[in-house]
Amino acid sequence: MKNQLLPELGKKTYIMGIINLTPDSFSGDGLLRERDYIRTALLQAEHFIQDGCDILDLGAESTRPGATPISTEDELNRLLPVVRSLREEMPNVVLSIDTYKAETARACLEEGADIINDIWGFRYDPDMAGTVAIANATAILMHNRTQGAQAVNSELGGRYEGVKYDDIVTEVRDWLAEAVDLAVEAGVRPDKIILDPGIGFGKTIEQNLFLLKHIDMLRDLGFPILLGVSRKGFIGHTLNLPQGERLEGSLAANAWGVLHGADILRVHDVKETVRLARMLDAIRFSELP
């Protein structure tokens, strides 16, 4: 069954632009430091759409290694004014909310959000799956076995210590399959499920690279794949570069992902990634008249 929200899945690469409504994003682009962060978020959204972005992903809680969790109240105070403004200014844009809290998801869906992007794959909040199902929303389920105490900091930025895996690709795939079962049992339609391997979460540099290398093996599950590698620590540590200089590494990782099964790219650098994806799609789907 086709996903009506993203009808060209499998025929084009979708680009999801990251809008961080935080003061402490790892990428340094958190908008909460701005005096009028709502207006700044709207301007960033407008630029993203002009550059070819397909989906806007709003997050109000930093997931960088070592970040302090925030309350649902604080999360909603940051998110709802922007969601309402975006819905008023851009009624047709696809809106994704990066949250793992059911109460936050419910409030944002009531204001017109389309997608819930849960970094815990419905494993954190027992009410999340049912909340998404009742709203008939699309769900992004990310693999994540991170423990908060496992953050490691260095001059190249924070990263998470890896979890021990005997076979990381198989274990990630099995974990995601269980997340799908959890979602479907709660009433989420299978055509509204997207999977994310969770690059950068609870994985070593080597594990991230190996999982990315074998991302095509996740296609066996039969669901669209979202890839989120933009500016992440494994790129910085591989290239010995701070987060502000990771564009080329991010583009390389995203290109590999597209060529090996990724359907959606979650990125900070929208314009450059849109051009990359359009060129790759032109080559991949080319036919002679």
Give the label of every model feature segment.
Residues 43-59, 260:
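Catalytic domains of carbohydrate-active enzymes, especially glycoside hydrolases
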Residues 14-16, 192, 224:
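Structural motif
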Residues 2-4, 9-10, 25-44, 63-81, ...:
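Active-site-adjacent loop and "lid" segments of alpha/beta metabolic enzymes
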Residues 9, 50, 189-190:
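Glycine-rich phosphate/diphosphate-binding loops that line cofactor/substrate pockets in enzymes
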Residues 92, 189-192:
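Short acidic capping loops at alpha-helix termini that bridge into adjacent secondary structure
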